[in-house]
């Protein structure tokens, strides 16, 4: 089958850059092997749910915070994980927002939430889940690096 005749599942997700001074909020999730993965607050969109609505919902569950004044930063899209059982077409929105509330995650996969200095974010996000997971793809983290440097683009092909 040629790549032109394949149908890939579509994975839609949204993540939010929450900033406090020179710190970025990251969530800590425990992987199946017991290791800790640091990621941006956010996650998968439900069928029919906009990326903006998914961002608001997921941030509330993963952090306990309420986001307001959601602002679009970037869209990442393209084929991912080619040749693996998780192969998909990804459509990921990145936003920033104002927020209020207390850090109190209710997502059972989240074991912690922490403010991380910008200078330390890149070191933490280099380590993640197994290679078959999209978060391991280094292109997923290029927009975060660019955002922290004040160089975010609106579109990132992956």
Name every feature range the model reports, one short phrase each.
Residues 23-61:
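Conserved Nudix-box catalytic region and its N-terminal flanking loop in Nudix hydrolases
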Residues 1-25, 44:
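Conserved N-terminal beta-strand and adjoining loop/helix that marks the start
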Residues 33-38, 108-158:
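Nudix hydrolase/Nudix homology domain
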Residues 10, 36, 89-91:
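Residue-level preference for beta-strand/loop junctions
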Residues 18-21, 29, 96-98:
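Active-site beta-strand termini and strand-to-loop segments that position acidic
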Residues 45-68, 78-131:
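Unchanged
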């Amino acid at each position: 089958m040629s790549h032109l005749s394949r149908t890939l599942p579509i994975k839609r997700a949204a993540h939010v850059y929450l900033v406090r001074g020179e710190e970025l909020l990251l969530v800590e999730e425990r992987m199946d092997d017991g290791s800790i993965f640091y990621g941006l607050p956010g996650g998968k969109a439900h069928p029919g749910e906009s990326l903006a609505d998914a961002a608001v919902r997921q941030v509330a569950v993963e952090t306990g915070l309420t986001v307001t004044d959601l602002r679009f930063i970037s869209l990442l899209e393209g084929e991912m994980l080619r040749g693996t059982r998780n192969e998909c077409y990804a459509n990921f929105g990145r936003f920033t927002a104002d927020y209020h509330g207390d850090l109190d995650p209710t997502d059972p996969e989240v074991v912690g939430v922490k403010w991380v200095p910008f200078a330390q974010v890149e070191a933490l996000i280099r380590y993640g889940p197994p290679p078959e997971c999209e978060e391991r793809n280094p292109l997923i983290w290029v927009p975060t690096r660019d955002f922290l440097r004040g160089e975010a683009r609106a579109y990132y092909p992956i």
